[in-house]
Regions:
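Secreted/periplasmic carbohydrate-active enzymes, especially glycoside hydrolases
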Residues: 1-106, 127-130, 136, 143-146, ...
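Alpha-helical scaffolding within the catalytic cores
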Residues: 32-36, 91-96, 118, 123-136, ...
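Active-site groove signature of glycoside hydrolases
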Residues: 130-158, 279-285
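Active-site cleft segment of glycoside hydrolase catalytic domains centered on the general acid/base Glu
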Residues: 117-124, 148-174, 183
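Short acidic, glycine/proline-rich loop/turn micro-motifs
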Residues: 58, 117-119, 247-252
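Substrate-binding clefts and catalytic carboxylate motifs of secreted carbohydrate-active enzymes
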Residues: 145-147, 161, 167-172, 179-180, ...
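Short, solvent-exposed turn/loop segments enriched in Gly/Ser/Thr/Pro and often Arg
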Residues: 27-32, 50-54, 86-95, 109-114, ...
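Flexible, glycine- and charge-enriched loops at secondary-structure boundaries
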Residues: 62, 66, 120-124, 156, ...
Length: 334
């Protein structure tokens, strides 16, 4: 029996020598792309995902235990997910293993993001070492299908050289899994979006972050946007969304209300349905999390409020919008 999100079958595998014995639970599956499709065990799948930070479910702190992982992933399961993006760094091993047991495919990444020192050799060695450590630890986790090498990195020649080396390093260590990165979109003319990044040639999927309706216009802009892509690869939106304070209500046009976030997700879902070759999404983010960059008093209070679940575990209205779409997708891919 091959491992799938619907039937996450694991086998006990024992290895022994004269001096040592190792036992592990391992699943078996295949993963590949074919044109704009992602194929798991030669069957097309849609990655119904969500992004997750390594934070405890009901209070501020670093998640580290199996119980923490199970709670976070149970929310993702209720949302209708079969996939999680563990951002923006390798999460603890309990999270990856619990995701495997519960039937979640995984995008795992290293913290190469924004504007780092691309031409610094020590910076590259740091990134490569984290990449090697991540792959060495989780190479036998069948649910990990994407190694991500970057997040929101502005275009430049030094950046491309840096990430090219990382992509090549991934494939030298693991030539089976998919290589991704969270690139950035571009509005080539009013209402027409694409990804125009030479890094995309090195990746197995066209993966990118976009915040149409939040950092880019209002929610109604989603109604006017169309997407075009030249490459025949699966399209994957690694981040989308907007913020809301749980319990804050008002007009659908008033930012940080649950109604604005709900409306944004409704319009976003309709926009996503128009994207050619879309094979997966991981909206930002499952749960509100601490962020010292977020200072709006009585709303943010040093929290990023883009979660579909509050920092206290309360589900916002947008949670149920995404849940409804994911349930529809689950039925359509049966």
């Amino acid at each position: 029996v091959l491992w799938t999100p619907e039937e996450p079958k694991l086998y006990v595998v024992n290895l022994s020598s004269e001096t040592d014995k190792v036992s592990d639970e391992i699943g078996f599956r295949t993963i590949r792309t074919e044109g704009t499709k992602i194929l798991l065990n030669d069957e097309e799948i849609f990655c119904r995902g969500i992004s997750i930070h390594e934070e405890t479910p009901y209070y501020s702190g670093r998640a580290y235990s199996r119980d923490h992982a199970r709670t976070l992933l149970s929310w993702a399961k209720e949302l209708g997910c079969n996939f999680v993006r563990l951002a923006h760094y390798p999460h603890n091993e309990e999270m990856v293993r619990e995701a495997e047991r519960m039937g979640f495919l995984v995008w795992s990444e290293i913290p190469v993001y924004w504007t780092i020192h691309w031409e610094n050799k020590d910076t590259y060695q740091n990134a490569e070492q984290q990449l090697c450590d991540m792959i060495a630890r989780d190479k036998n986790r069948c649910n990990v299908i994407i190694w991500s090498i970057a997040n929101e990195t502005p275009l430049s020649e030094p950046r491309l050289a840096f990430l090219t080396k990382l992509a090549n390093k991934v494939r030298s260590l693991d030539n089976v899994r998919l290589v991704g990165a969270a690139m950035e979109k571009e509005e080539v003319r009013p209402g027409v979006m694409t990804v125009n990044d030479p890094l995309g040639e090195l990746l197995d999927i066209i993966s990118f972050n976009e915040y149409v309706g939040w950092y880019d216009g209002d929610s109604e802009k989603c109604d006017r946007v169309n997407w075009v892509f030249d490459a025949r690869k699966p399209v994957f939106i690694s981040e989308l969304g907007g913020g809301a304070l749980y319990g804050r209500h008002g007009s659908r046009k008033e930012r940080f209300t649950e109604e604005y976030q709900e409306d944004l997700y409704i319009r976003h879902v309709n926009m996503l349905k128009r994207i050619p070759g879309l094979a997966g999404t991981t909206p930002w983010i499952l749960k509100d999390f601490r962020s010292p960059r977020r200072h709006v008093p009585e709303i943010q209070d040093d929290f990023n409020r883009k979660g579909l679940v509050s920092d206290k575990g309360q589900k916002k209205k947008a949670f149920f919008v995404l849940q409804k779409w994911y349930r529809e997708l689950e039925e359509s891919y049966k």
